Amino acid sequence: MPESSVRPRRIVVGVSGASGAALGLECLKCLRQAGAESALVVTRGGEITIEQELGMTLDEFACYADVVYDNKNIGAAIASGTYPVDGMIVAPCSMKTLAGIASGYSENLLLRATDVQMKEQRRLVLMVRETPFSAIHVDNMARLARVPGVMLMPPMLTFYNGPVTLDEAVHHIAAKALEAVGVSCANYKRWS
């Protein structure tokens, strides 16, 4: 029996320094609720954003993950294509991180883990956070959009699902990202 059928889905969540740390947190919460295994890697900018936007320490945030990797640990399991992972979500994905991914510049674990997802042609969802976009941002996104398995998913608000609170909007966006890596999330309202 293939290994993927005997273990829960394993998803890497990366958090970089763009605004939107709540997206990463909601992904972790939904993964836990779905019975999937989560691995977390956070950049220094992501840690600052978590503290500023959520009022949480990195340790408090990391409690929602099954495994936590230090972003400096370039030799971690998720840095190897032989380690079985079903997909990765970078939520949020800063333009700096996007540029590193687009150029194959794997200077830290988050960037290396994304590089592994691409070389193994696994699903990689990038929740890019910036507005407005510059021509350089768009060029980097266009470059990545052509890579098999990569999905660019700016966290755009949807209104067809009738969100009343910001938490509901964040949940919907996180659930959409999780669906893209094969994890069903409770209370995800699809268009019907």
Regions found by a protein language model. Give the residues of each.
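A cross-family phosphate/adenosyl-ligand binding-site feature
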Residues: 1-125, 130-192
